[in-house]
Amino acid sequence: PETHLIPSALRAVLGQAKKLTVFGQDYPTPDGTCIRDYIHVEDLAQAHGAAMHWLRDHDGWQAINLGTELGTSVIQVLRRVSEIAGRVVPHVLSERRHGDPPKLVASAAKAREILGWIPAHDLGSIVQSAWRWHQAPRY
């Protein structure tokens, strides 16, 4: 089953899934929900391409984090999905999940330095393209 927030929210908006469950509303964050770093699949693909070029030209390897370095809360994502979809994301608030950290945001400094990579998509672009994909006919 899908567990990623944006596709789960879009499926809930489209009536393809039950209400989305928001786990935790008492984290030490501005709105009490977890903060995560959301990245567009096209940005990931660009970074992987840059990494392949780097590997071709260098010996060894590097561990490199990829992210936008921008944290967005669960509630902020749901608001953005609602704005783009034109419908409120049906959701329920629940208890925290054991082990969920309040905030996870990646540093992309090494990716910038070594690969010359910078993500091109913001949260609005991520949600907009996911919304188009989820509305497209399936064959």
Predicted regions and their residues:
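C-terminal substrate-binding subdomain of Rossmann-fold SDR/epimerase-dehydratase oxidoreductases
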Residues: 6-139
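Catalytic helix-loop patch of NAD(P)-dependent Rossmann-fold dehydrogenases
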Residues: 1-4
